[in-house]
């Protein structure tokens, strides 16, 4: 297991602020390379009642990004769309470890749940 220097706890936020974040389970159904991007890939995510394209900087974190196809993960789905490398991201993949400089892993439910299930 990798080791880290534990980061300081961020300033408190209210429960009301936290409840504004819409975190849902989705299944990664595919991915595309983004031309000219070293780390960024475009994920096609099934969120139950709709699909989203979500950009994630995970290309270099795995020997083969296709390893995550078919996996469920957590996504923030109420972020404003953001354009990167000419592509629009409609959310954010939750991962664990990137902010601490270790090899990131997906934040996943412990067993399969319906796509679109809310976290929190």
Predicted features and spans:
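Phosphate-backbone binding interfaces of nucleic-acid-interacting proteins
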Residues: 1-120
């Amino acid at each position: 297991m990798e080791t880290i220097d534990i980061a300081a706890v961020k300033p408190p936020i209210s429960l009301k602020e936290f409840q504004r974040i819409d975190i849902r389970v989705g299944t990664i159904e595919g991915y595309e390379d983004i031309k000219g991007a070293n780390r960024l890939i475009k994920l096609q995510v099934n969120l139950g009642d709709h699909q989203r394209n979500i950009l994630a900087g995970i290309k270099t974190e795995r020997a083969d990004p296709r390893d995550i196809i078919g996996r469920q993960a957590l996504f923030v789905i109420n972020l404003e769309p953001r354009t990167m490398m000419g592509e629009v991201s409609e959310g954010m993949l939750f991962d664990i470890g990137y902010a601490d400089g270790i090899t990131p892993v997906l934040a996943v439910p412990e067993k399969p749940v319906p796509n679109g299930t809310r976290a929190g």
